[in-house]
């Protein structure tokens, strides 16, 4: 039962961390939110702990104040010689008190590659990670209609004829010295017999050891970062990189680079052994292919003395906006202000001017892009990107802060200029329009 005690201990650590995160933002008078799932007041359930499955020895309930209360199941003392462990039940039973065979727990199943899997069922997926190493395999589990898959690095084996084991995509050695521990549902999970494989296997924070020592905390389906790829910081043998696959989306849209897994659309700087992180190259995961491009720095900067900053490819202008009449909260005459950035790039007679507004609700950056050639507007468009993606763009300079009303005036004037400058030469009209975003000092320091 040491393995089960270990799993329960991990769960209560997770409950503490989960509760501290959700107390302020996940509170509601009518429901509780736990592991990104809503529960009604009074509703009870067994929590799901990846990759062990449902923890039947823990009961959770949604209290009236919106808090999740979880408690360990206390098993009664049995007075029979051979108690029986039953799947989907925590406590063993005496043979004469077994429940009916058709008493099944129903949960939402998963559909993957034409096969239906039940909630809590583990299986092996082929072809999910296109660039996996020969000693790696992908193991998946079904949880409430979602498929959770992990890229697992298998331990090095020293035997000639390894065997397959239940609920694991890695093969292990068969031997007299095999140890075992109880799985969450009472199944027996075999540990590699040879010393080297066993030592490597125990370094995985996802696999329960036979006694009490653990390599670290596992990742849970309810973790806040589980949208896209979740990357384990350890790169040792036996680690798992966990991703979430939603049944409504295509499977296998991930890329693996330098031992790390990235979801479709995610960007990163490559890490080369000889050079470290290459800041001037940006790679993007396109379905399962990596597309890497060199970052081109501008020849001219809107400031006189751009600075080189560690971790950035291109030089950047110092972020010192003009002195304006803002209070300590960044407001102007009681109205909330938002940062405005500008970028000007000139090449071969073509000027690309970008004006960006950073907002908090929603948390994004709205970028207005003007492409002008010989004074004639060639192209104009607006794009909205995340703050994280905007942070990867190093050619923007913080120029001022503005209010929502001033930004509306800017966009209205911009719409007029986009029509006028497409048919006649515009030299300074756009530069003049940007001045609308600058907030002047109120007369006599009164609003």
UniProtKB/Swiss-Prot annotation:
Motif Cell attachment site positions after renumbering to this chain: 174-176
GO MF annotation terms: BMP binding; transforming growth factor beta binding
Gene Ontology biological process: AMPA glutamate receptor clustering; BMP signaling pathway; cell differentiation; embryonic axis specification; excitatory chemical synaptic transmission; eye development; negative regulation of BMP signaling pathway; ossification
Signal peptide annotation: 1-22
Domain VWFC: 30-95, 108-174, 253-318
Subcellular location: Secreted
Primary localization class, coarse: secreted
Tissues expressing this chain: Expressed in heart, brain, lung, liver, kidney and testis.
Modification after translation (UniProt): May be glycosylated.
A single cellular component GO annotation: plasma membrane
Listed PROSITE patterns: VWFC_1, VWFC_2
Glycosylation, residue list: 113, 286
Region (Disordered): 200-224
Presence of the UniProt keyword Ligase in the record: no
One family name in Pfam for this protein: CHRDL_1_2_C
This protein's UniProt keywords: Developmental protein, Differentiation, Glycoprotein, Neurogenesis, Osteogenesis, Repeat, Secreted, Signal
Stated role: Seems to antagonize the function of BMP4 by binding to it and preventing its interaction with receptors. Alters the fate commitment of neural stem cells from gliogenesis to neurogenesis. Contributes to neuronal differentiation of neural stem cells in the brain by preventing the adoption of a glial fate. May play a crucial role in dorsoventral axis formation. Antagonizes the function of BMP7 and may thus play an important role in the embryonic bone formation. Shows no inhibitory effect on the inducing activity of BMP2. Plays a role during anterior segment eye development.
Designated name of the protein: Chordin-like protein 1
Annotated source species: Mus musculus
